[in-house]
Amino acid sequence: VDWVEKKNLPLSNRDYHSLQWLHYYLLQQGLIDQAASIFAIQQKDMAEGIKTRSNLRAGKYYYRMLAASFIETENWEIIDDFSPPNGWKPKSFSEAGYRFALGFSTAMQGKIEEANKHLLKLKAIRKKDFKKNYYKRIEYLKVWELEIQTAIKLYQNDFAAAIKLAKQ
C-alpha cells in the first residue's frame, strides 16, 4: 500500500488482494483495531474511486473484508457501521457476496425476516445473473444460501434442520 503513495502512483495500483489478506491475518491474530485501520483504507479508496471513477477495483474486496470483520470477531452488529458508499455498483458476484454478508449477519442477530429478504435476493442473483462462464462461483452462492439458512435454523433452535442443511 505504502509503495503506491511513495511512488506517487494512482490508487488503482494498490494490491487489494494482499490488503484483504493482511486484514484477515490481523483479525485472526485478534488485532481488531489494526484490522479496522486496514479496512478503513479499503473503504476510503472505494469511496474516492467511485467519486472520481478512477479506482473501481477497491470495491471488489468490500464484501470480503466486511464479512471477515464480523465473522472472525462474531460481532454481528458491526455490519451496520459499514454501508457501501453511494454510487457503488458491484458486479453480480460482489453483490451476491454483499447479500450473503447482510443475510448471515442478520440471521446471527435473530433478525429472521430481514435475513430471509437477503436470502431471496441472493437466490435471485444466482438464478438470473449467473451463467456457466463464472467458473465454479455459482457453487459459492449455493453455499452462502445454505449458510444463511443454517444460521436461521440455529437461531430458531431447530438443530436437526440446521445439521441437515449443513450436511448438504
Regions found by a protein language model. Give the residues of each.
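Solenoid-like repeat scaffolds
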Residues: 2-10, 43-55, 82-93, 121-138, ...
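Start-of-helix signal in alpha-solenoid helical-repeat scaffolds, especially tetratricopeptide repeats
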Residues: 9-12, 16, 56, 60, ...
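Generic long, charged, amphipathic alpha-helical segments
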Residues: 144, 159-168
